[in-house]
């Protein structure tokens, strides 16, 4: 398939058959407090959209909202909430780290070099660009045999938010585990020391109102 055709095909499919997430209702109580751990997210290396490797220690001292994302999902409109949230809290130390993933109904088919065009021109579209504190990295697996070590860590550290993960025919990975990420736009809130503190189901959002009190709590805490 020619370069760029993957994204073009995905745009066409989204237009024709209306690809969306399995649910769009907010469930404000779908969150859990994480367990204490001696490890931190600063121990993990990640890949940029340009194929270079870096680590998360560059965000030491910040409160981090960690999100797995996808372009062709109803929850992609949450991107339009991210920028105002970051604008409000960036001076206090909030940043957002996003990892595209194609494991949920193949809703992120683009290659790394195509991802930003998908966000700008398709969903959320209308020329959307990320806030300077919204950092989008290369595609990863968040579940299954090849899940990224970062996600293995945060899933082990934070209890599951729901009893049922989803339909197996919509999950593009194996094996399915009880701790798995449930869908696109699941979130982990990380404190200034790199410790996972709270886990939020994708539906626990309500334009950010569900997560905001927890963000403010962690912003008020000093780094060790």
UniProtKB/Swiss-Prot annotation:
The keyword Translocase does not apply. Residues 1-18 form the signal peptide. One of its GO terms (molecular function) is glutathione peroxidase activity. InterPro entries: Glutathione_peroxidase, GPX_AS, GPX_CS, Thioredoxin-like_sf, Thioredoxin_domain. It is found in: Secreted, Extracellular space. GO terms for biological process: response to oxidative stress. Keywords: Glycoprotein, Oxidoreductase, Peroxidase, Secreted, Signal. The active site is at residue 73. It catalyses: 2 glutathione + H2O2 = glutathione disulfide + 2 H2O. Its EC number is 1.11.1.9. Glycans are attached at residue 38. It comes from the Eukaryota. One of its GO terms (cellular component) is extracellular space. The keyword Membrane does not apply. Pfam families: GSHPx. Belongs to the glutathione peroxidase family. This is Glutathione peroxidase 3. It comes from Caenorhabditis elegans. The lineage of its organism: Eukaryota, Metazoa, Ecdysozoa, Nematoda, Chromadorea.
